[in-house]
């Protein structure tokens, strides 16, 4: 056999062996390892679904609509109608887009009217959708600005509703990453069980 043919066969064997090792490692070992780690923390690996009376009502990780003035409202969604998770994504409108500016002004007027505040007092995250369009959190400022509306609609004192907001405010991740947040689903579930 010629030297060129021997080298070609050796390289082909090496390439085939690399393909088999990569297929086994990335197609079997890695997925099984991720699955095993997920089984160690099943509540976190299964989407953090929240159940009430055995029925799933939402996920701590995905925003959803709460129609009615008696509920805290999440950020606006760019994910289709009704927080459609299959349409998750940003609006892709730039900061100088007239469509974005028009949407922000419409949201500002609607939120100000619903919460009974001046348009300049609307929290910034009540005006813009998150990158995914399905953010389950609002800022503590946004939640606090909704307290009066929610308290009046539910017949609760503003102090009681404000205390629920404070109880459900989470600090920065690791103490320094990101901003404090309020999970809207968790807050609304606590609100649901709050006695007037």
From Swiss-Prot:
A Pfam family assignment: KdpC
Main location: membrane
Keyword Cell membrane: yes
Keyword terms: ATP-binding, Cell membrane, Ion transport, Membrane, Nucleotide-binding, Potassium, Potassium transport, Transmembrane, Transmembrane helix, Transport
Bilayer disposition of the protein: Single-pass membrane protein
GO CC field: plasma membrane
Subcellular location: Cell membrane
S-S bonds: none
HAMAP family: KdpC (MF_00276)
Family stated for the protein in its record: Belongs to the KdpC family.
Role: Part of the high-affinity ATP-driven potassium transport (or Kdp) system, which catalyzes the hydrolysis of ATP coupled with the electrogenic transport of potassium into the cytoplasm. This subunit acts as a catalytic chaperone that increases the ATP-binding affinity of the ATP-hydrolyzing subunit KdpB by the formation of a transient KdpB/KdpC/ATP ternary complex.
Quaternary structure (record): The system is composed of three essential subunits: KdpA, KdpB and KdpC.
Protein name: Potassium-transporting ATPase KdpC subunit
Native source species: Kineococcus radiotolerans (strain ATCC BAA-149 / DSM 14245 / SRS30216)
Gene: kdpC
